[in-house]
Design a protein with these regions (language model features):
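Arg/Lys-rich, positively charged N-terminal/basic patches that mediate binding to nucleic acids
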Residues: 1-35
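Generic structural signal for secondary-structure transition and capping sites
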Residues: 19, 26, 41, 45-48, ...
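Short, hydrophobic secondary-structure boundary micro-motifs
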Residues: 30-31, 51-53, 94
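Basic/aromatic recognition patch in beta-strand/loop cores that engages polyanionic ligands
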Residues: 38, 45-79
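Enriched for short, Lys/Arg-rich terminal
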Residues: 67-70, 74-99
Length: 99
């Protein structure tokens, strides 16, 4: 089984999203963090179970259920790279510059 690894940029995005949610609703930042970690477990279990964005690149997306958040990941030969944790309505495809 391939394991997931967060890129530094994705770590920063997750931390920022957790803080933003917690400021709006105390305690909910932890719920967001937990849901992202659960998503990572599902991604590791079913690596290719979620669709790619389009034919322009290898990125796949996992949409969270309870939060307006998408986990963007790329499957390599050795691992699953979590390249972005997109919270809210950020500019579509901004993470593609990270390739």
């Amino acid at each position: 089984m391939k394991h997931a690894r967060f890129t530094p940029a994705a770590v920063v995005e997750l931390e920022d999203a957790v803080r933003r949610v917690d400021r709006a609703r105390p305690g909910w930042g932890d719920k967001l963090n937990d849901e992202v970690l659960e998503a990572i477990e599902r991604i590791e279990e079913y690596v290719e179970g979620w669709q790619t964005f389009d034919e322009r690149g290898p990125e796949r997306r996992f949409v969270l259920d309870r939060f307006p958040c998408i986990v963007v990941y790329v499957v390599t030969d050795t691992e699953i790279q979590i390249t972005a944790v997109v919270y809210g309505g950020r500019e579509p495809g901004y993470w593609r510059k990270r390739r």
